[in-house]
Amino acid sequence: MQLNSTEIAELIKKRIAQFNVVTEARNEGTIVSVSDGIIRIHGLADVMQGEMIELPGNSYGLALNLERDSVGAIVMGPYTDLAEGQKVTGTGRILEVPVGRGLLGRVVNTLGQPIDGKGPIENDGFAPVEVIAPGVIERQSVSQPVQTGYKAVDAMIPIGRGQRELIIGDRQTGKTALAIDAIINQKDSGIKCVYVAIGQKASTIANVVRKLEEHGALANTIVVVASASESASLQYLAPYSGCTMGEYFRDRGEDALIIYDDLSKHAVAYRQISLLLRRPPGREAYPGDVFYLHSRLLERASRVNTDYVEAFTKGAVKGQTGSLTALPIIETQAGDVSAFVPTNVISITDGQIFLTTQLFNAGIRPAVDPGISVSRVGGAAQTKIIKKLSGGIRTALAQYRELAAFAQFSSDLDDATRKQLNHGQKVTELMKQKQYAPMSVAQQALVLFAAERGYLEDVELNKIGDFEAALLSYANNEHADLMAEINAKADYNDDIVARLSALIDSFKATHTW
């Protein structure tokens, strides 16, 4: 069969008319330099701050520097395979991480990917890593307690749900131990926990996970890991990822607790990124926005009101408030709290628990310095019985420290001063507590009651620990109903006072320690 030119032309026109091409507009750029986890991109015009950029090899970058003719981005993951001239694509999306109950009991990296070998995670969707904190109208004042299980903290520096309480001190003073015990104490409280490890050794993190598992607290906890071996970009993003995972519970009318361990290493990672991006350095070579780095993170810890929760859940949850309580950790150098990052975080938070090397080395653990430790909003959240009984504890310790300083230079002390010194020493001894042994409200109340009512006066100083252990064992075995009642109601009235007095009197009459 022969085709003439007219038929061929018609056939071609028909094919052209039928040809359907899908046009795709892509925002594409070219890598012009790669160094230390930082890439510079030319030609990526339509890009926003914090946008995810698709890189060759199924990895992503995050746009941080938007300049006139280039974009500076950090690589989330390995960057050794990237080279100049490679094409990159803007995604138009902000970084998101998986959230939901499926993350509880799991160890994940900054991007929410499981690293514990327990298989994939069933999440309830994704949420942005960077979120604007709830406004003033959406918040509610702090009025419910978070029990850490430590007598010294719950009595003198109480923490409320939705509070930001800084744990600050030199290295090896028990900061992480305090935070881990606070998590262990939440296993039956209904408070979900998030532990964010930033720039720590992998062996240290593995030990923390093992301890949480041993004490039955891992099932209630999400562990987010950005270890020392990971890039500065992942260490920088880790706290925001953990915060997003904690906000999932807050926004649904539940309570959550998040530990940032620690924000000193977080600031160092951000300083490294900023200097590599050639941002101008300021004090201690930190960039100018290092305050905003931590304030935008810690402001997300809050107690939100019922209207906020109802609006967020579209009416599914009514009459419930939600909270996210933050315990950021800061490591100081030689006790210098006036350095740049410590002063920043002190001014952002609602109080600080200051741990000192001197107290730690003297065997007073937790090494809390009651003189400069403070909780600015937690007093309103303290349980009634602990609030009534702890009033004299801080005063006794403050007077003891003052008198002890003078007593060094004076040998002839009057009886009143000697009695006060003796009482202060015993209260100091009583505030000591072993790691991984958090105490219930009733146990704390009983011990504080004994100190407040003078039951320790005839107990020798070196026997205080034995007296406490024997008293608690007796109370738990013989007066379990009273202990359960205090744990449930935390009331302080004449009936409770009489029953506690009778308990201690009968114990002292029938027991030795």
UniProtKB/Swiss-Prot annotation:
Enzyme category, top tier: translocase
Key words of the record: ATP synthesis, ATP-binding, Cell inner membrane, Cell membrane, CF(1), Hydrogen ion transport, Ion transport, Membrane, Nucleotide-binding, Translocase, Transport
Annotated site location: Required for activity: S373
Pfam families recorded: ATP-synt_ab, ATP-synt_ab_C, ATP-synt_ab_N
EC code(s) of this entry: 7.1.2.2
InterPro entries for this protein: ATP_synth_asu-like_sf (IPR023366), ATP_synth_asu_C (IPR000793), ATP_synth_asu_C_sf (IPR038376), ATP_synth_F1_a_nt-bd_dom (IPR033732), ATP_synth_F1_asu (IPR005294), ATPase_a/bsu_AS (IPR020003), ATPase_F1/V1/A1_a/bsu_N (IPR004100), ATPase_F1/V1/A1_a/bsu_N_sf (IPR036121)
Places the protein is found: Cell inner membrane
GO cellular component terms, semicolon-separated: plasma membrane; proton-transporting ATP synthase complex
Catalytic activity of the protein: ATP + H2O + 4 H(+)(in) = ADP + phosphate + 5 H(+)(out)
UniProt cross-references to CDD domains, sorted A to Z: ATP-synt_F1_alpha_C, ATP-synt_F1_alpha_N, F1-ATPase_alpha_CD
Superkingdom assignment: Bacteria
Membrane topology: Peripheral membrane protein
Residue sites binding ATP per the record: G169, D170, R171, Q172, T173, G174, K175, T176
Gene Ontology MF, one: ADP binding
Subunit note: F-type ATPases have 2 components, CF(1) - the catalytic core - and CF(0) - the membrane proton channel. CF(1) has five subunits: alpha(3), beta(3), gamma(1), delta(1), epsilon(1). CF(0) has three main subunits: a(1), b(2) and c(9-12). The alpha and beta chains form an alternating ring which encloses part of the gamma chain. CF(1) is attached to CF(0) by a central stalk formed by the gamma and epsilon chains, while a peripheral stalk is formed by the delta and b chains.
Family recorded in the similarity comment: Belongs to the ATPase alpha/beta chains family.
Function: Produces ATP from ADP in the presence of a proton gradient across the membrane. The alpha chain is a regulatory subunit.
Protein name in UniProt: ATP synthase subunit alpha
Protein source organism: Tolumonas auensis (strain DSM 9187 / NBRC 110442 / TA 4)
